[in-house]
């Protein structure tokens, strides 16, 4: 979910 920097699952 971040700006391509860190992958965080937006659930």
Swiss-Prot record:
Mediates visceral muscle contractile activity (myotropic activity). It comes from the Eukaryota. The modification Valine amide is found at residue 11. GO terms for cellular component: extracellular region. The keyword Secreted applies. This is Periviscerokinin-2 type 2. InterPro entries: Periviscerokinin. Belongs to the periviscerokinin family.
């Amino acid at each position: 979910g971040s700006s391509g920097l860190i992958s965080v699952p937006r659930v």
